[in-house]
Regions:
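Bacterial N-terminal signal peptides that target proteins for export
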Residues: 1-9
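Ubiquitin-like/PB1-type beta-grasp interaction modules and other compact soluble beta-rich domains
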Residues: 3-4, 17-176
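Bacterial N-terminal signal peptides
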Residues: 9-17
Length: 176
């Protein structure tokens, strides 16, 4: 009986290791530039489902945030409200041009690349040609670094080298 009990305990322990996820497993996710938009006459950020090579309407707000997301942590929109009137209200409309609000949020220190400093947010009204796309608006304000596929890797030199890397989820972002 003692031998049967010992075998049962060992078998249970082995099965538990196989079928129960270890508590020490690390959650992973991606650190990247997230792209958000707010259509004219709205102030709600919506995650862009296409890249910045789309036409944008006069009165829209374009938002970029250096963010983290994974299975356990959703990405977050820029921390500045997408309020066109607040961003561009003092900028007069010009014939043949459009006004676009631009927000660039460099994210949080908790997921900043090692050795790099999070920059100050950029909130600016951009007056641009009617045919300008999101990437044109962004490029009027700061230097854009892209990879060969067009993925935005760096804005204003941040981050300096990486491009959409997988990292361990910062503990401060995980639900407790």
């Amino acid at each position: 009986m003692k031998k049967t009990t010992t075998v049962a305990v060992i078998a249970t322990a082995l099965l538990a290791q196989i079928f129960i996820a270890p508590a020490h497993a690390e959650s992973k996710g991606w650190r990247y530039w997230g792209y958000y938009q707010a259509a004219a006459k709205t102030n709600t950020w919506v995650a862009a489902m296409t890249g910045p090579t789309v036409d944008i309407a006069d009165g829209s707000v374009e938002g970029w945030i250096f963010t983290f997301s994974g299975d356990d942590v959703p990405s977050t929109p820029p921390s500045v409200k997408a309020d066109f009137n607040q961003i561009c209200g003092k900028t007069k409309a010009q014939s043949g041009k459009k006004r676009i609000g631009l927000v660039v949020d460099f994210g949080k220190r908790t997921y900043a690349p090692k050795g790099e400093k999070v920059q100050k947010r950029i909130v600016q009204c951009v007056v641009t040609a009617k045919e300008s796309q999101g990437i044109d608006v962004l490029g009027q304000v700061l230097k854009v670094r892209q990879d060969d596929s067009g993925l935005i890797c760096g804005l204003a030199g941040y981050p300096a080298k990486e491009c959409g890397v997988e990292i361990t989820a910062p503990k401060s972002l995980l639900k407790k």
